[in-house]
A protein has these predicted regions:
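Short hydrophobic alpha-helices and adjacent helix-cap/hinge residues
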Residues: 1-294
Length: 294
């Protein structure tokens, strides 16, 4: 029976696991019936990913599914032969996972979430809620260097003053928010990162504690009390990763499977959080929302 290795930063999440399994099932694969899995999860500790990737490779899996930039790179460094399906935030060509989007080459393919290209839109959204010329804080994982450089370039091109606070692991989050508060930022842009998604409840709680409006990439943040998100569907990306995994199980080569990019994006606003922050969401913004959480 084929084995799928699962490598991720966070803990198990039933919603995300179910999305991946739906993608597999679309192509006729069901865990426990005709395919099995070996999961390795770093539980928020980036330093564990390299060793966990090596562990998975030593089990001779049929393929590896890696969620997040650092996990994908760890898997790629651990093997050049085992097929890899990734879900990442960055340009896979820039970070060395693929030769190009149409024909990746090598042993890795998957889904790129177009994070940096959405930053300008998210900046525009948050600027509708804060005073002109306000400083915006950026919470980012320093391991995502390409993403940081792209966001800083976007900020410069728009004249946006940016205070960068770095957080690599969960213990870094409180000091990062303390830095942003000290810098008197008016709002926070939370960068896309698998660790941030895994720690979303803590990040949302910190933003609330410090009365900071924050915008995020995915609806999973406003679902737990974050103010606003704009971006693609995580569940949709994982479901697509499931279909790619199934194609590889059927004999497709990663080098021939084009890297997918999302084409649909959703604006989600948590109106309860807005009221608690004393923010009046403009009617024009509410009308553009795909979902308003009461």
């Amino acid at each position: 029976m084929p084995v799928i290795g699962m490598l991720s930063l966070g803990s198990a999440t039933s919603e995300f696991d179910a999305a991946f399994e739906r993608g597999l099932a679309e192509r006729g694969y069901v865990f426990g019936k005709n395919v099995t899995k070996e999961a390795r999860r770093a539980r928020g500790n980036y330093d564990k990913l390299a060793q966990l990737a090596k562990e998975l490779v030593s089990l001779n899996p049929t393929l590896i599914v890696a969620s997040g930039n650092v996990a994908a790179l760890a898997a790629r460094r651990a093997t050049s032969t085992v097929p890899i399906v990734f879900i990442i935030a960055s340009d896979p060509v820039k970070i060395g996972l693929a030769k190009n989007l149409a024909r990746p080459g090598g042993n890795a393919t998957g889904i790129s979430m177009l994070t940096a290209t959405l930053t300008l839109k998210r900046l525009e959204l948050i600027r509708e809620l804060v005073p002109p010329n306000a400083t915006v804080g950026l919470l980012i994982n320093p391991d995502n260097k390409d993403l940081l450089l792209e966001i800083e370039e976007i900020a410069r091109s728009t004249g946006q003053s940016l205070e960068v606070a770095e957080a690599r692991n969960p213990d870094d989050l409180e000091p990062a928010f303390a830095q942003l508060v000290k810098a008197q930022v008016s709002a926070v842009l939370v960068g896309n990162d698998a660790g941030f998604l895994a720690q979303r409840a803590q990040i949302v709680a910190l933003a609330k504690r410090h009365s900071l409006p924050a915008t995020y990439e995915f609806r999973e943040f406003p679902a737990v009390g974050g103010l606003m998100s704009y971006g693609p569907s995580v569940a949709g990306a994982l479901q697509k990763a499931g279909t790619y995994a199934a194609l590889i199980l059927k004999g497709a080569q990663p080098s021939d499977l084009p890297i997918e990019q999302p084409t649909a994006f959703e604006l989600v606003i948590n109106s309860t959080t807005a009221r608690s922050l004393g923010i009046q969401i403009p009617a024009s913004l509410l009308l553009r929302a795909n979902e308003v959480i009461e």
